[in-house]
Amino acid sequence: MASNFTSIPVLDYPSSLSPSTKPAFLAELRDALVKVGFFQVRDPPIPLKLQQDALRLSAQFFDLPTEKKLDIENVHSKRFLGYSRINSESTASGTDYLESILLGPNLPELGPEEPVYLHLQGPSQWPDEVSVPGFRDVLESYHSQIQDFSIEFARLIAEALEMPLDTLTKLLGQPLFSRLKPTRYLPPSMNPAAEDGSHGIGPHKDIAFMTYLLQGGTHNCLEVQNKLGHWVPVPPVPGALVVNIGRLLEVITGGVCVATTHRVILKRQGFVDGDGKSLGPRISLPFFQFVNPRLTVDDVLVDVPHHIKDLVPDQVATTEAETFFSGLFNNCIGDNIFVNHLTTYPRVGKRWYPDLMQLASEKQAESKRLDEQRRATEGHI
């Protein structure tokens, strides 16, 4: 479980490249993995111009007329890929006040004989080149480079936990399953449905293996919850990615690495600078890295050295994690990724998979119950 941290660690990626500084980097990474579950990585090997272009073109896409964005709405895709209209997504806590476009890697569609969760694989929907020139080229390039970085970072995570370097990367599978999700959050003054203090996205833990988030602008909206239940801000750091552990990595390590609850809160002060000047909408680019969806929980569990397990702030976290997640990941990993898509994008689910919506609702309710049970045990409620 997350410790009583009061700030989010910032790690310098170049320090991982030098033999003289790598040991200190790995020690900092290990501490962040075990005690916080959230950290920022400064100066990743992704060109700054590419980062800026991806944010700029994402903003241009969201500025398109609504009817133009709806041409590629996700309800047209059984893979859930495409534009998600404002206020149409949800977490267990309710409606999320955001709009987004979900993009996948450039992979072919699989046949109907494959398991239903593999229907998530296939081509993305893209705005036409005239509407947002360069959008597809830049976002595909960013997706490719952040994915390559995430694979390299999985090796660093294994090394920080003193496991063989390929312990985690061999679970990722080929082709790699991932999602890039450019997202826009409007200030409350621009969203009639949202009040000051509404959730851009409600408190949740990512179902992914790892998440790599590029924050645009200097908005102060992202918050992480510590063991005491206090919300700790994640201020944007120029040239840094926000990295957080997903539930999959917590399962894989038996609770040694901690998936931390976080949210995006929409308060007026988060959308203004120090002089009170409006910063406009918040643009972010989360990248979600998954393991091979065909694997089961038994396939992915790894042996973390005992002396690393001993670093967990409260040893009960190890045993609780296995019990807690067995109720969510009781089939293959892909089944649960698919259920998460159904509950996050209910309009898509009702169109393409109406017979599965009841199961998805039951899974979401069970997830929420277990979350509340665990939080009560930790003293959050």
From Swiss-Prot:
Record has Transport as a keyword: no
One term of GO molecular function: metal ion binding
EC number(s) per entry: 1.14.-.-
Keyword Iron: yes
GO BP terms, alphabetized: small molecule biosynthetic process
Cofactor list: Fe(2+)
Keyword field: Dioxygenase, Iron, Metal-binding, Oxidoreductase, Virulence
UniProt cross-references to InterPro entries, sorted A to Z: DIOX_N (IPR026992), IPNS-like_FE2OG_OXY (IPR044861), IPNS-like_sf (IPR027443), Oxoglu/Fe-dep_dioxygenase_dom (IPR005123)
Pathway: Mycotoxin biosynthesis
SUPFAM superfamilies: Clavaminate synthase-like (SSF51197)
Gene3D superfamilies linked: B-lactam Antibiotic, Isopenicillin N Synthase, Chain
Cofactor, free-text remark: Binds 1 Fe(2+) ion per subunit.
Stored Pfam families: 2OG-FeII_Oxy, DIOX_N
Family per similarity comment: Belongs to the iron/ascorbate-dependent oxidoreductase family.
PANTHER family recorded: 2OG-FE(II) OXYGENASE FAMILY, PUTATIVE (AFU_ORTHOLOGUE AFUA_3G14880)-RELATED, OXIDOREDUCTASE, 2OG-FE II OXYGENASE FAMILY PROTEIN
Protein role: 2-oxoglutarate-dependent dioxygenase; part of the gene cluster that mediates the biosynthesis of gramillins A and B, bicyclic lipopeptides that induce cell death in maize leaves but not in wheat leaves. The nonribosomal peptide synthetase GRA1 incorporates respectively a glutamic adic (Glu), a leucine (Leu), a serine (Ser), a hydroxyglutamine (HOGln), a 2-amino decanoic acid, and 2 cysteins (CysB and CysA). The biosynthesis of 2-amino decanoic acid incorporated in gramillins could be initiated by a fatty acid synthase composed of the alpha and beta subunits FGSG_00036 and FGSG_11656.
Record's protein name: 2-oxoglutarate-dependent dioxygenase FGSG_00048
Source organism of the structure: Gibberella zeae (strain ATCC MYA-4620 / CBS 123657 / FGSC 9075 / NRRL 31084 / PH-1) (Wheat head blight fungus)
